[in-house]
């Protein structure tokens, strides 16, 4: 049952070695990432890997599922970690904060499996970026676009994305 629920929610947890690779890659960049956003925190794997990094002043971790939020809050993360119970698409719309690093593994939910309100939010994001609605075939697309709106001018987005991201259809439009 849990696997079916995770699939419907687009939850595919990032392997620890992938997170370690991402962490090492960022370390080679020698940047200071003061404010970090994790827009789909899930089970907290990225938080576990990054919470003690000296170059990070604050991590905001957004999670839609209340049960996971409660579990994360009970873990006792350092005080610079803020866990927010919200839909990231709503969070991105409301926040005025900008982040130097946005990192994570967005949900992979095919448009056919999205709830109607999620479809509407995703399409609104496409419109905001003056992109055709036909681009919105999966929730990860909306997450990437919403993340762009939360990013500082010289910031970095580092997401685990599917191969389809490299298809001309996605890369050619903008």
How does the language model describe each region?
Residues 1-75, 84-87, 92, 106, ...:
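Class I S-adenosyl-L-methionine
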Residues 43-45, 64-68, 132-174:
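Conserved Class I SAM-dependent methyltransferase catalytic core
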Residues 81:
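Short, conserved active-site loop motifs that form the nucleotide-linked donor/cofactor pocket
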Residues 86, 101-104, 111-113:
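Acidic, glycine- and histidine-enriched catalytic cores of nucleic acid- and nucleotide-handling enzymes
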Residues 93-102:
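A short acidic, Gly/Pro-enriched loop at the edge of an enzyme's catalytic core
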Residues 108-136:
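Mobile active-site "lid"/loop adjacent to the S-adenosyl-L-methionine
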């Amino acid at each position: 049952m849990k696997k079916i629920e995770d699939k419907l929610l687009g939850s595919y947890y990032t392997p620890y070695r992938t997170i370690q690779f991402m962490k090492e890659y960022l370390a080679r960049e020698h940047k200071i990432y003061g404010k970090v956003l994790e827009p789909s925190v899930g089970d907290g794997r990225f938080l576990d890997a990054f919470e003690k990094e000296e170059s990070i002043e604050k991590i905001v971790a957004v999670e839609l599922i209340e049960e996971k939020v409660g579990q994360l809050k009970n873990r006792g993360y350092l005080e610079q970690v803020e866990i927010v119970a919200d839909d990231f698409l709503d969070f991105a719309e409301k926040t005025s904060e900008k982040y130097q690093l946005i990192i994570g593994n967005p949900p992979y939910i095919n448009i056919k499996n999205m709830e109607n309100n999620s479809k509407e939010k995703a399409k609104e994001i496409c419109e905001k970026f003056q992109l055709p609605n036909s681009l919105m075939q999966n929730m990860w697309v909306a997450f990437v676009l919403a993340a762009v709106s939360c990013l500082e001018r010289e910031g970095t987005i580092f997401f685990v994305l599917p191969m389809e991201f490299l298809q001309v259809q996605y890369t050619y439009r903008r």
